[in-house]
Amino acid sequence: MIQTFSSTIRRKEMDAVLTCMVDEKIGPGELNARLIQTAKEFFSCAGAVALRTPAAALKYALKALSLEAGSGVMLSALAPFWQFLTVEELGYKPILLDVQPESAQVSAEAVSEGIQKGGRALVLRESLGILPDFEGILALGIPVIEDISQSAGGFVPLTELSASGAEGQSAQNAAAQKPAANEGSQEGDGASKAEVAGKKAGTFGIYTICSLEERDTITAGGGALLMAAGRRDWPVLKSLAEGISSIEMLPDINAALATVQIKEFSRNEARRKELFALYNRSIMAGKNKGFVRDVELNSTIWAFPLSLNGGFKDAKAYAQKKDIEIRLAFEDSVIAAKAEEFAAECKNAKALALRTAVFPLYPRLGRTQIEKISKVLVTLP
């Protein structure tokens, strides 16, 4: 059976983790600090904290915003359910936003409606690796916390941003708008990012969460990065970080894995894009469709999502007969957990939660496996 998800763990990752174990220093320490430095360079942020859970990252991001108790915090209906729970636990009011059916992203219009309902901050989930309308959303003047767990490495060329949109919400460091030469110069990634100036996913909001869980684009086996893109916003987060206990910090054994994953990102992403292009050609002859995205620059290839023409159960059974496991893309989302409560106001999200399947797409797939998946994409009912 070809599994839907598989972490890309090569010898470099294994060696890094084994070295950490041999040194008998697996708790938060030197490698946690090294991961932070690597993240600062890769994501072009002013500062970062490596934490044990994504929920902790969201908690400290919201604390850094200093929202009043009971304030409304807007979430995508397709955001992971832990975000809803975290917002409630902190004493804020979750306000769910519906998404656009063609991209699975919240729109500026949806955010505007959320503000009218009392939203005072937005956690911007960039689902499926697709980037939203940053310019339209930021123009509303609401504090934004980006969630780039699936969109890490995404990139918006300056040609697509107005002067105001390019500034984001804070004073970005200069590297955020330089050509992404470090990430784009490796073989197979194409010349696109190496030659085009722009802004990276994670540099548009005030703070950014990058979950490092097993099925995220970059994995540490668990944990999260919390980043501040701008120099003006980092001191607030830094002050909070100084009071964080070691039990909430990411252990070195996880940090070792994450550091290598970030350094190997371009190599892995180049392979994922090759597979995505191949799969995309396959679905052109089938009954089901993909999502609107710019594969070359704007989006990250987290997996291969497909909006099904029929029911998921039938598609799952068909794929299983061909020894391929597929899963619902949003099985852990807010709308999946709270369908009865929010179905009426989040109709698009509910439909996508029921009919969006993800197919196996990861670098270590073999030729025979890739051919099998491609054939199923063509013939899937």
Q: Where do the PLM segments sit?
A:
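Conserved SAM-binding loop
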Residues: A50, L75, L226
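Active-site phosphate-binding strand-loop segment of PLP-dependent enzymes
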Residues: E102-G165, N173, K178-A220, L226-R232, ...
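Conserved PLP-binding active-site segment in aminotransferase class I/II-type PLP enzymes
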Residues: M1-A64, E68, L90, G366-K372, ...
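PLP-dependent aminotransferase class I/II
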Residues: A33-I36, C45-V49, A121-R125, F134, ...
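Conserved PLP-anchoring active-site segment centered on the Schiff-base-forming lysine
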Residues: A61-G114, A319
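Histidine-centered beta-alpha loop that forms part of the nucleotide-sugar donor binding/catalytic region
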Residues: L78, Y92, V99, E126, ...
